[in-house]
């Protein structure tokens, strides 16, 4: 894992920010499994009324906040799975770029496509996680003929799992799909930049059933 410092750094940043959320939660509202909506809004969650007031920075800051420890744990584990593959194959800069760009576009998709009265609150790195997987998936399909069958199967299984879980209750599916679409486009861009010189997608494959418990 220490061979992938940017992935480790991102996981550490998410953990530190959540620790700050929990500290504020305990200080002002008492212990709870989920962070208070007011704290999430105050710290920069995706909140349409605030965005309409010009607080566009929430499209980014919301990607670093999490609603509960389980929420953080799931996204951190997904980052542990997908981050090193992007970092190994495309570089540290591309990993940071992918995380930030797809996370923001996922947040934007939520605001554009979410059908509600606009009073919802959205937070989490899921859009960025889906973006990272989008890059991996596109690169894998581009190099499909040169990929081991195990890796091809891993990509397909995770795509089905990620899309399927997006329809669960209380899940921001538009943020997921917005991040995924942005990741696929970035994957196309990255592969195009290295066409003819890039090696096949490589990476340690984790069993899909271990990816989403």
Question: Could you say what each language-model-derived stretch is?
Answer:
Residues 1-212:
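A detector for small-residue-rich transmembrane helices and their helix-helix packing motifs
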């Amino acid at each position: 894992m220490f061979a992938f410092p940017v992935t480790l750094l991102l996981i550490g940043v998410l953990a530190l920010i959540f620790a700050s959320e929990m500290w504020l939660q305990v200080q002002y509202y008492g212990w709870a499994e989920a962070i208070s909506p007011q704290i999430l809004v105050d710290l920069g969650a995706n909140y349409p009324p605030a965005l309409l007031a010009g607080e566009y920075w929430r499209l980014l800051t919301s990607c670093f906040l999490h609603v509960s420890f389980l929420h953080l744990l799931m996204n951190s584990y997904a980052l542990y799975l997908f981050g090193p593959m992007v970092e190994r194959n495309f570089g540290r800069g591309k990993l940071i770029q992918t995380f930030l760009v797809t996370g923001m576009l996922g947040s934007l998709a939520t605001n554009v496509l979410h059908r509600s009265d606009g009073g919802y609150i959205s937070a989490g790195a899921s859009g960025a996680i889906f973006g990272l997987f989008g890059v991996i998936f596109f690169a894998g399909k581009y190099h499909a003929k040169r990929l081991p069958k195990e890796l091809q199967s891993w990509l397909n299984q995770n795509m089905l799992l990620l899309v399927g879980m997006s329809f669960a209750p209380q899940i921001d599916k538009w943020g997921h799909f917005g991040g995924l679409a942005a990741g696929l486009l970035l994957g196309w861009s990255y592969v195009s930049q290295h066409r003819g010189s890039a090696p096949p997608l490589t990476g340690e494959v984790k069993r899909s059933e271990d990816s989403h418990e």
